[in-house]
Amino acid sequence: ICTEPYSDTSLSKEFSLFPFPLSDFQKYSIEAINSGNHILVTAHTGSGKTVCAEYAILHYVSLGKKVIYTSPIKALSNQKFCDLKKKFPDISFGILTGDITDNPTADVLIMTTEILRNRLKREKFDSSDTVTSKFTLDIENDLGCVIFDEVHYFSDKHRGVVWEETLMFLPSTIALVMLSASINNPETFAKWIEDRYKDNREKDVYLASTNHRIVPLTHYGYMCIGKGELAYMKEKHKSDYEKYHNNLDKFLLLKNDDFSFNLNNVKIIKDIKSHIYKSKIHVNQSFAINTLINKLKEENMLPAIFFILSRKNIEKYAFMIEQNMYEDDSTTSFTIEKKCESILRNGIANYKEFLMLPEYQSMITLLKKGIAIHHAGILPILREMVEILLSEGLLKVLLCSETFAVGLNMPVKTTVLTSLSKFDGSGDRQLYSSEYLQMAGRAGRRGHDIVGHVIHMNNLFEMPENHEYNLLMNGKPQTLCSKYHMSFDSIMLNNSKSTTNIDELTSLSGNSFATVAIQSNITRMCDDINRLTLEHGSLIKPTKYDDNVMTEYNEYIKLMASVSQNKRNKMVKQLQKKKDNIVDLDNCLKYQDKNKKFDEEISLLEENINLQKNTFSDQIANYVDMLIEYGFIEDSKLTMLGDIALLIQEVPNIVMSKLLVMCDNFKDLSTVDLIMLFSVYNNTRLLDDKFTIPDRLNFKLTDTLRTLDALHISVTNQALERQIVAFDGEINYNMLCIEEWLDVTTSDEAIQFLHKIKCEYGLSLGDFSKAAMKIINIGLEMTNVAIKIHDVELEHKLSTIGSLIEKFVVTNQSLYVT
């Protein structure tokens, strides 16, 4: 644990590789990397964690070793690839994101964590598999280091298991550079990393943390009302006017960099909001946004990022902004359209098709005022264009979703929060402190700003309770917790090399971070048993207490309760005799009751300890039972159905492989039918989501979809009964419009189609493109299946999916990968 000021001068040469003085945590990181150990860096956004990754690349490439850089999202992978290529022109870089593959034999490979996990998992269980491998690197011998950017994704509800399995499966010889936002339990996590290999521990983990920001943050609240409303307040509520008007259209300090929380200013803001509500004063969103933006411009607090946690409001708010954000003498308004065209022309061959898009023209309208938008519903190419403009200092105001805060190195002078709550898939909730700090941390540019500003647009959201507001800005960082669970894939991969070995799988699961929590629970429960046993032993038994007599007495009481009233009356006298025969009955009953409670508590704890110990073996047995029931394992060996399933990752493989066999290798389906079939596993959302099969489809496709639906429900229900995880996601028919896209042949037709799905269905161009690329990836996986089962007809039908879908602006291109 690196807490002392760094004083060693032996690495001065290494430190001098960077043109600025290094912080202590950066120096410790370089020492760890130089000595071949692991490093876990936990620090706020903007603290300089990138230095650690860059040194690791320089160091291990100089040793002739390969480096893998993993990131949580494709957009971050693409940007890192571009940035690192520019920074280190003498080092070769490659990228693998599922959609894009470029230079897979490079010195440094940048990839999503899923791709590395899938490769490691298959290598762990089946070293003979070459069909599905995305890259041919000899991990055991040639890989020197893996850099995990944003390693706090380890706790992500849906994807955390990917990070955990990747860390579990990496060989002990490979150094880890783990970069994370501040976390609450770094020591526990670091110890788990060290102990993964038990007796084969080869490396220590350096834990280097910092709470220091190079550019400190100051957090403000902000309220405004119109001049007319202010005049009304002055006339009708003079005392309130005197009290509040000096705090309107002002930045009221909420928190300094020293973690202090200004309760007085919070109270002022709440009082103003209360007065506005009681006086029925209406402050519309457009007025609030324009007033704040004018203030930011006047106070020289641009560029600014507005985080808007509802995608539909991003464009709405952007077009509310009335004034040009550029300085009066700036020529950027007149040149930015040509700049955008140049960015696209230099990045992609079909740039003219993007220039024709209404979305592009709409974006240009905003850009001419220094304003841009950024969210997942926008085409990746256009999002990247915005990122490039921001990185070159050509934008003044960016309105974006929370995703922009994840990793993308785009600091600004000011960040603005338009809400403190978000929809998380199941309902609205307040932001976690870690989420808030990730967004707030984008404020403050190293080398440009003395302080970064964080503004809360209190006009636009309900204020939290005071203690919640304080915790949001000053709360503990997130605690890393395991999301590990066994999976169908792990069981099948284990069976692909041998017969089912539950002990081996249980041992593998025992290396997970989940085991740390399980062992902690067991230790706590054992301590509770010891405490209860001591307390139990200290109970004072009444002198004349007799177990047999008391048991007989209690049974007689139970018997009386079960008989008729008439019989019960006759038994009362007998009961009284029994009472008279027991000396000190009240104390005997109290002792017996306490004794029973101790026994029950200890028994329950012992039962729970047993359940904890058998967590994984029970889970594994349930997975194996399901795989046997559905025909993936037979006689403890993987069947052909299991072999097929292992080639599928993009969709629930248990369902799709079973469907393939049940529907005779899809022999009755055309290529278009297959595209429609693959389209039902998507994450798109429409104005009116479609969860039922449309009537317009042909009989063969409809019949296949019904079979798929029934199979999906069956597998889901069976998994729920066994309390195991089957898969995420649900079937929907939101992307069946893809059929119409297949007939598009001209740019005009493409624009008409894309306009139609946006206006009629609420399906954005970015979402449509992402879902379309997924269908192509499913087709590629199913092609591997067709090759595996020697089905030439199916392989032929699948071979044209890519060319039918990938056209016009619906592509996997990236401006960062050219």
Regions found by a protein language model. Give the residues of each.
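Conserved segment of the helicase C-terminal RecA-like domain
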Residues: 410, 414-424, 429-469
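Conserved P-loop/Walker A NTP-binding site and adjacent catalytic elements of P-loop NTPases
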Residues: 20-214, 222-223, 304-308, 316-326
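Conserved interdomain linker/interface between the two RecA-like ATPase lobes of SF2 helicase motors
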Residues: 168, 175-177, 182-320, 372
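Conserved Walker B
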Residues: 150-152, 395, 404, 420, ...
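Non-catalytic terminal extensions of ATP-dependent helicases
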Residues: 368, 372, 377, 388-395, ...
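Conserved C-terminal RecA-like helicase domain
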Residues: 69-70, 78, 85-97, 284, ...
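Conserved two-lobed SF2 helicase motor
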Residues: 105-121, 369-383, 389-409
